[in-house]
């Protein structure tokens, strides 16, 4: 067999995937499969390979299920209610605490994140109880240097389930942690909630001392600026250096991978070590035997980061093959590395880093050499084949050298783009063709920076000189990234392609890796299938049951998105405050493939609804900006026209009788004057698939009364979406009598306290008997409209309410909410 380890690795992948997506009672089946496969492999000579594959499938499923189901009765996932419980938790830090930076109101806030192996739990004022399992600790601020990997600690805080997605389609943190075997999160308010636990160790580990020394060494003679911190991030895996717009710039240019301790770092170290040892005349066995411990020392010194461990395993397999003087096959070595990693830590299969690492390296093993050979053989200006290379002119030799290097770089970039594209879209909602060009510049510069870092750490002299060279190289990387990011059409946002993309995608890769494309017929068949898959992916799936309209309400109730099927004139109503816009609204828009908002409308002058307008104008600029008529004391509302003018975006004010993105405005009226901004909030009446929505964000009691007087029975709607005004009563009885809704959505947040729904309102709506949903409790909601039904789903996709319409003419049907 050409690549004997490829199929076993795929069997383990299939087993882990089956354990995640098939029913929970797969456990006995996977155990049976593992035993059956082992028996078949041991007793039936001809069925050895089949039995081995079945056994590996079962082993992969069992290995993953062992991380998902608490086997110990004292596991914290059994003992603690995920809804939240205050207490103290005791355990061992499983890693070095990682500091994350978050920008809030123009200031950088520090937050510490670390995994904890639990040994004990004390609920409230009770006694200590034995416990096991893993939790994730998230704490405001940064604890002191006494807390490091392997330290015994006691932490006080709120133990609860991790948060789910902030909006439909965004990153699901709870699922991510669950797949890593972490089911609970401990939230702390300050480093004062951390204490040393029993048996605490005062001796700082060698890896912590090395990182402290290395950061000081690499910053010697350099200013304390972003480039210096990025050098720490790239050479030492210091994640804190990647914060703010720097992270986004490298992400969009497709060069963020250089800051993860991954294959680029490990391969460069391995090549440098082997070259140096070979110059000394040492044998392969000696070179490999000395290089591998040094590689693993670097991995351990930088904190055993998953990307570094993956790359070290791959490199160890390749170097081991070279040491033993065995025929090398990169794809076969890659399969062995994946097999080992997934059996030891199956949750890595669901990490974007794992998928990108292995898919990109697999692509580099399959495609670039063939593409380069094809180009060199078919280029119009290829040299005379009868003229020996030794007789070429100096200009011709220089041209050939440059062309081959450029061709190799472009083929490598294209192969990496082809391999990473679906995963990048699925995980990061980003397509970056400019990465092919950007990596031609950034990757060589990053290699030079890493070499300078290595010389700075290893050389006793010239430290400041090597650091200066690395600093200049890092500025070159920043400049190249910014230039490539600014190229029109170089990158764009894209919606997740969906599961239907993965099956043909995987089949194409398996075919390319397993079947030699050495005949014209095979090559034509493969490329035809790849072209068909690409065409279907770019055109997007056509779902006959796709909703005719969708209303997305964000968790805080301060922003709404109206999406009409087949209509590009969608609407963003409000943006939330600056933090909500940056953390939720803009990422969600990009997750749906929106780089420019067709229409942005501001409902009223509450800063919690329009504070994020500058963020949206910068990140996903709208084609037009709309605001209601009326006077307000809000400085932000008064600044809207100036913001639009500065961004060269058309701005207009609307009143009752106008339309916004084709949706009628029914409030406010230009002739009316309201003393409070909430009473003059813009109210929209939107019809989708025969369903009528009344959108009245934070409409005050005076505004509600004015609407009832003016519209009368014309206010009737199937769904009422409103919020909590700053003063006055929300959803008054007269207003509800005029609207006569079949479903009410109270769109409000839980912070600050004034945004929360008052108990009197909750009691009154319960007595009304109309199904009511509260975003402060449920989170973001998505209302999907079909002609025969209306469904409301939360951010996880769970059904929360449904309205059926059996007879649209008589408006009969039933409504349910849960």
Model-derived features: positions:
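N-terminal leader/targeting segments
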Residues: 1-78, 82, 86-87, 141, ...
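Membrane-embedded alpha-helical segments of integral membrane proteins
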Residues: 2-43, 351-354, 358, 464-515
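Hydrophobic alpha-helical transmembrane segments
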Residues: 2-6, 236-240, 302-308, 387-390, ...
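Hydrophobic alpha-helical transmembrane segments in multi-pass membrane proteins
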Residues: 7, 15, 23, 46, ...
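Residue-level signal for inorganic ion chemistry
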Residues: 15, 91, 353, 420, ...
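Membrane-interface helix/helix-cap signal primarily in integral membrane proteins
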Residues: 57-257, 583-587, 596, 630, ...
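Non-globular, low-confidence helical/coil segments that flank catalytic cores
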Residues: 143-145, 151-152, 156-158, 175-176, ...
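Hydrophobic alpha-helical segments of integral membrane proteins
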Residues: 203-221, 230, 238, 246, ...
């Amino acid at each position: 067999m050409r690549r004997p380890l490829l199929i076993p690795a795929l069997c383990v992948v299939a087993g882990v995937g089956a354990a995640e997506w098939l029913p929970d009672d797969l456990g006995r089946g996977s155990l049976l499969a593992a035993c059956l496969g082992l028996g078949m492999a041991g007793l039936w000579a001809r069925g050895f390979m089949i039995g081995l594959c079945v056994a590996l499938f079962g082993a992969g499923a069992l290995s993953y299920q062992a991380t998902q189901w608490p086997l110990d009765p004292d596991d914290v996932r059994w003992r603690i209610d995920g809804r939240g419980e205050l207490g103290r938790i005791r355990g061992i830090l499983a890693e070095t605490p990682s500091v994350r930076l978050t920008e809030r109101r123009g200031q950088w806030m520090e937050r510490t994140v670390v995994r904890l192996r639990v040994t004990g739990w004390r609920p409230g004022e009770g006694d200590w109880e034995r416990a096991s399992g893993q939790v994730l600790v998230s704490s405001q601020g940064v604890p002191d240097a006494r807390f490091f990997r392997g330290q015994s600690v006691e932490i006080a805080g709120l133990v609860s389930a991790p948060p789910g997605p902030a909006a439909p389609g965004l990153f699901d943190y709870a699922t991510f942690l669950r797949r890593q075997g972490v089911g609970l999160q401990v939230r702390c308010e300050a480093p004062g909630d951390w204490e040393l636990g029993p048996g605490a160790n005062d001796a700082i580990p060698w890896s912590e001392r090395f990182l402290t020394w290395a950061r000081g060494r690499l910053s010697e003679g350099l200013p304390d600026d972003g480039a210096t911190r990025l050098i720490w991030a790239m050479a030492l895996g210091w994640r804190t250096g990647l914060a703010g717009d720097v992270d986004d710039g490298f992400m969009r240019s497709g060069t963020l991978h250089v800051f993860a301790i991954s294959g680029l770092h490990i391969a460069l170290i391995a090549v440098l070590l082997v070259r140096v040892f070979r110059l000394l005349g040492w044998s392969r066995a000696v070179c490999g035997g000395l290089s591998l411990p040094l590689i693993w020392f670097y991995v351990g010194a930088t904190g055993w980061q998953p990307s570094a461990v993956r790359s070290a395993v791959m490199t160890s397999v390749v170097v081991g093959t070279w040491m033993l003087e065995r025929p090398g096959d990169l794809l076969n070595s890659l399969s062995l590395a994946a097999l080992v990693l997934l059996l030891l830590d199956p949750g890595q299969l669901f990490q974007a880093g794992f998928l990108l690492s292995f898919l990109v390296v697999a692509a580099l093993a399959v495609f670039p050499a063939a593409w380069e050979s094809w180009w060199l053989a078919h280029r119009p200006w290829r040299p005379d084949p009868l003229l020996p290379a030794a007789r070429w002119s100096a200009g011709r030799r220089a041209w050939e050298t440059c062309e081959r290097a450029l061709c190799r770089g472009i083929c490598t970039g294209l192969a990496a783009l082809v391999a990473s594209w679906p995963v990048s879209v699925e995980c990061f909602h980003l397509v970056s063709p400019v990465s092919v060009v950007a990596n031609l510049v950034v990757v060589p510069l990053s290699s030079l920076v890493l070499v300078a870092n290595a010389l700075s750490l290893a050389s006793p002299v010239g430290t400041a000189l090597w650091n200066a060279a690395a600093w200049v190289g890092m500025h070159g990387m920043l400049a190249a990234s910014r230039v490539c990011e600014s190229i029109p059409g170089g990158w764009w946002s894209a919606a997740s392609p969906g599961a239907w993309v993965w099956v043909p995608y995987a089949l194409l890769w398996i075919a390319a890796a397993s079947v030699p494309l050495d005949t014209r017929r095979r090559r034509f068949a493969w490329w035809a299938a790849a072209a068909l898959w690409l065409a279907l992916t770019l055109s997007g799936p056509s779902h006959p049951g796709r909703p005719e309209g969708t209303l997305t309400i964000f968790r805080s109730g301060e922003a709404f998105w109206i999406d009409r099927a087949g209509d590009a004139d969608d609407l963003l109503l409000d943006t939330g405050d600056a933090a909500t816009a940056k953390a939720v609204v803009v990422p969600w828009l990009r997750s749906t493939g929106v780089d420019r908002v067709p229409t942005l409308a501001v409902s009223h002058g509450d800063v919690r609804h329009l504070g994020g307008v500058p963020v949206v104008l910068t990140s996903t600029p709208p084609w037009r900006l709309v605001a209601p008529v009326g006077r307000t004391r809000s400085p932000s509302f008064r600044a809207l026209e100036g913001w639009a003018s500065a961004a060269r975006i058309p701005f207009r004010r609307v009143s009752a009788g106008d339309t916004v993105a084709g949706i009628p405005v029914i409030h406010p009226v230009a002739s009316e004057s309201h003393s409070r901004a909430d009473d003059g909030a813009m109210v929209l009446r939107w019809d989708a698939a025969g369903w009528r929505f009344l959108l009245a964000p934070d409409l005050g009691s005076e505004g509600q009364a004015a609407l009832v007087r003016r519209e009368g029975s014309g206010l009737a709607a199937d769904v009422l979406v409103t919020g909590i005004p700053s003063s006055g009563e929300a959803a008054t009885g007269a207003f509800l009598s005029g609207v006569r809704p079949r479903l009410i959505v109270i769109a409000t947040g839980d912070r600050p306290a004034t945004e929360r729904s008052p108990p009197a309102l909750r009691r009154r709506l319960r007595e009304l008997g109309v199904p009511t949903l509260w975003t402060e409790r449920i989170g973001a909601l998505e209302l999907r409209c079909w002609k025969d039904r209306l469904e409301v789903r939360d951010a996880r996709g769970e059904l929360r309410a449904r309205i059926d319409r059996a007879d649209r003419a008589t408006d009969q049907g039933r409504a349910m909410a849960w």
